[in-house]
């Protein structure tokens, strides 16, 4: 029964209200689907591709070139490290000091590239449709919340993890309530 026929003040049974509300819900769903379809088909980005080859040709055409983001010769010269700094970095990383000049050039290129990446402005208000699942600025948690999360953390048995399987004091000769016991004499012999 259409809702227009339900007149205020008249007595109607429960079935009449159920039928009327289901009709209203059905119309609401139909309207929503029509609005969605009209939004989907009314917006246009460009002409449709007529063939698969046309689509592949469009996708094969680059929209940007890597050279646009690589540093210029001036940037490389400005970012180049001294020989001492390069030797120190090679020593710290355990790499051989074979061709210092080539390593300096590569490091300068990489530093210039990183500088260019850091200079790109990033809008902090991302569109929620494209935002990642992680929050950009997660709130700090307290000690109690950390302990609660650690207790709720389930072990992955497929990786061989067993809950409560590690006892740090199992091999200790002196222990009490899960703690190591140290004698004063051991501390003085240091």
Swiss-Prot record:
Pfam families: GatF
Gene: GTF1
Keyword match Cell inner membrane: no
Membrane topology: Peripheral membrane protein
Protein name: Glutamyl-tRNA(Gln) amidotransferase subunit F, mitochondrial
Principal subcellular localization: mitochondrion
Species for this entry: Eremothecium gossypii (strain ATCC 10895 / CBS 109.51 / FGSC 9923 / NRRL Y-1056) (Yeast)
Assembly information from the UniProt record: Subunit of the heterotrimeric GatFAB amidotransferase (AdT) complex, composed of A, B and F subunits.
Note: This protein may be expected to contain an N-terminal transit peptide but none has been predicted.
